Regions:
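Glycine-rich adenosyl-binding loop in Rossmann-like folds that engage adenosine-containing cofactors
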Residues: 1-35
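Conserved acidic-Pro-Pro-aromatic motif
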Residues: 40-134
Length: 134
Protein backbone atom coordinates (compact mmCIF):
# COMPACT_ATOMS: atom_id res chain seq x y z
CA UNK A 1 0.00 0.00 0.00
CA UNK A 2 1.33 3.41 -0.95
CA UNK A 3 0.84 6.66 0.90
CA UNK A 4 -1.34 7.77 -2.01
CA UNK A 5 -3.72 4.93 -2.77
CA UNK A 6 -3.54 5.26 -6.57
CA UNK A 7 0.12 4.11 -6.51
CA UNK A 8 -0.63 0.97 -4.49
CA UNK A 9 0.23 -2.25 -6.30
CA UNK A 10 0.62 -5.97 -5.88
CA UNK A 11 4.14 -5.37 -7.20
CA UNK A 12 6.90 -3.70 -5.22
CA UNK A 13 7.38 -0.04 -6.06
CA UNK A 14 10.81 1.03 -7.36
CA UNK A 15 12.94 3.80 -5.86
CA UNK A 16 12.81 5.80 -9.13
CA UNK A 17 9.06 6.03 -8.74
CA UNK A 18 9.13 7.18 -5.12
CA UNK A 19 11.94 9.65 -5.93
CA UNK A 20 9.73 11.22 -8.62
CA UNK A 21 6.57 10.97 -6.50
CA UNK A 22 7.32 10.83 -2.75
CA UNK A 23 3.61 10.34 -2.01
CA UNK A 24 3.89 6.93 -3.73
CA UNK A 25 6.08 5.65 -0.86
CA UNK A 26 5.30 2.23 0.58
CA UNK A 27 3.53 2.43 3.94
CA UNK A 28 1.87 -0.94 4.59
CA UNK A 29 1.06 -4.42 3.30
CA UNK A 30 -2.29 -6.14 2.91
CA UNK A 31 -3.24 -9.67 1.84
CA UNK A 32 -5.76 -9.80 -0.98
CA UNK A 33 -7.43 -12.61 -2.89
CA UNK A 34 -6.74 -12.73 -6.61
CA UNK A 35 -9.23 -14.32 -8.98
CA UNK A 36 -8.96 -14.70 -12.73
CA UNK A 37 -11.53 -12.78 -14.73
CA UNK A 38 -12.12 -15.98 -16.70
CA UNK A 39 -13.43 -17.57 -13.49
CA UNK A 40 -16.27 -15.04 -13.31
CA UNK A 41 -16.82 -14.38 -17.03
CA UNK A 42 -20.05 -16.39 -17.12
CA UNK A 43 -21.65 -13.56 -15.11
CA UNK A 44 -21.38 -11.25 -18.14
CA UNK A 45 -24.17 -11.03 -20.71
CA UNK A 46 -23.00 -13.22 -23.62
CA UNK A 47 -24.54 -10.85 -26.18
CA UNK A 48 -22.86 -7.67 -24.97
CA UNK A 49 -19.39 -6.60 -25.99
CA UNK A 50 -17.14 -5.36 -23.23
CA UNK A 51 -14.65 -2.53 -22.79
CA UNK A 52 -12.11 -3.96 -20.35
CA UNK A 53 -10.35 -1.27 -18.29
CA UNK A 54 -7.28 -2.39 -16.35
CA UNK A 55 -5.39 -0.10 -13.97
CA UNK A 56 -3.38 -2.34 -11.66
CA UNK A 57 -0.07 -0.50 -11.32
CA UNK A 58 2.15 -2.88 -13.28
CA UNK A 59 0.07 -6.06 -12.89
CA UNK A 60 -1.81 -5.54 -16.19
CA UNK A 61 -0.28 -8.46 -18.11
CA UNK A 62 -1.22 -10.83 -15.29
CA UNK A 63 -4.81 -9.59 -15.46
CA UNK A 64 -4.86 -10.09 -19.23
CA UNK A 65 -3.44 -13.61 -18.85
CA UNK A 66 -6.25 -14.45 -16.45
CA UNK A 67 -8.87 -13.14 -18.85
CA UNK A 68 -7.88 -14.68 -22.19
CA UNK A 69 -11.18 -16.56 -22.65
CA UNK A 70 -13.20 -13.47 -21.74
CA UNK A 71 -11.06 -11.36 -24.09
CA UNK A 72 -11.44 -13.82 -26.96
CA UNK A 73 -15.21 -14.14 -26.58
CA UNK A 74 -16.53 -10.79 -25.36
CA UNK A 75 -14.02 -7.95 -25.16
CA UNK A 76 -14.06 -5.40 -27.98
CA UNK A 77 -11.79 -2.69 -26.50
CA UNK A 78 -9.06 -2.85 -23.85
CA UNK A 79 -7.97 0.25 -21.95
CA UNK A 80 -4.91 -0.09 -19.76
CA UNK A 81 -2.07 1.79 -18.16
CA UNK A 82 1.38 1.05 -19.60
CA UNK A 83 4.72 2.11 -18.18
CA UNK A 84 7.53 3.60 -20.20
CA UNK A 85 9.85 3.19 -17.18
CA UNK A 86 10.13 0.32 -14.67
CA UNK A 87 8.15 1.97 -11.87
CA UNK A 88 7.44 -1.38 -10.18
CA UNK A 89 9.46 -4.60 -9.82
CA UNK A 90 8.54 -7.07 -12.57
CA UNK A 91 6.60 -4.57 -14.66
CA UNK A 92 6.15 -5.47 -18.33
CA UNK A 93 7.81 -2.91 -20.63
CA UNK A 94 5.60 -0.89 -22.99
CA UNK A 95 6.84 -2.61 -26.17
CA UNK A 96 6.30 -6.08 -24.73
CA UNK A 97 2.77 -5.15 -23.62
CA UNK A 98 1.89 -3.91 -27.12
CA UNK A 99 3.25 -7.16 -28.63
CA UNK A 100 1.25 -9.22 -26.15
CA UNK A 101 -1.95 -7.35 -27.03
CA UNK A 102 -1.20 -7.91 -30.73
CA UNK A 103 -0.98 -11.65 -30.03
CA UNK A 104 -4.40 -11.38 -28.36
CA UNK A 105 -5.64 -9.91 -31.68
CA UNK A 106 -5.82 -6.27 -30.55
CA UNK A 107 -4.30 -3.25 -32.28
CA UNK A 108 -3.60 0.21 -30.84
CA UNK A 109 -6.47 2.65 -31.18
CA UNK A 110 -4.76 5.59 -29.42
CA UNK A 111 -2.54 6.53 -26.48
CA UNK A 112 -2.89 9.37 -24.00
CA UNK A 113 -0.34 10.63 -21.48
CA UNK A 114 -0.77 9.17 -18.02
CA UNK A 115 1.67 9.90 -15.22
CA UNK A 116 4.19 12.67 -15.94
CA UNK A 117 7.17 13.41 -13.69
CA UNK A 118 6.61 17.10 -12.94
CA UNK A 119 10.32 17.67 -12.26
CA UNK A 120 11.69 16.21 -15.51
CA UNK A 121 8.46 16.52 -17.53
CA UNK A 122 9.06 12.95 -18.72
CA UNK A 123 5.99 10.85 -19.46
CA UNK A 124 6.35 7.72 -17.33
CA UNK A 125 3.03 6.04 -18.07
CA UNK A 126 0.58 6.05 -20.96
CA UNK A 127 -3.06 5.12 -21.10
CA UNK A 128 -3.43 2.74 -24.05
CA UNK A 129 -6.63 1.93 -25.91
CA UNK A 130 -6.67 -1.19 -28.08
CA UNK A 131 -9.42 -2.45 -30.37
CA UNK A 132 -9.97 -6.03 -31.47
CA UNK A 133 -8.98 -6.75 -35.07
CA UNK A 134 -11.92 -7.76 -37.26
Amino acid sequence: ISLNSHSSSILQINKEHTDAAPSAAFVDKEKVAIRKLDSISTAFDPFKKILLKIDTQGFEKNVLAGAERLIEQKVKIIQLEMSLLPLYEGIVPFEEMVSYLNRLNFKPLFYSPGYVDRTTEQIQQLEGYFIKNK
